Amino acid sequence: MKIVYDENKNFPVSWEELHRNSKALAWRLLELGPFTGIVAVTRGGLVPAAIVARELEIRVIETACLSSYHDKSRGEVQILKPASMAEDGKSWLIIDDLVDTGETGKVLRQMMPNAHFATVYAKPA
């Protein structure tokens, strides 16, 4: 399956590709651990975080619920639920499916300045 990046910024990825790429991400993160736990960025980071957690044998998964899309248009990032267990992020791994503008990452970095942040994909500028 050929993936074409179109003008609408759609980035179709199959479940098999997401699984394979999430496992590959876990293998790259292996030498950076051990991690106390994973913070999955909802909603996109939930599936990759589960795969990474399984590969790295991490049993503690916290969520950070953020929203930047309102009625299908991008707006300011809103924190719906912080990852309270992660505190400043020391020895925690933040997982999201993709980075687009970087705004979500900036908010997460302010919340957890000592965490390691990783995404499966990055959209081209």
Where are these regions (language model features)?
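PRPP-associated nucleotide enzymes
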Residues: M1-A125
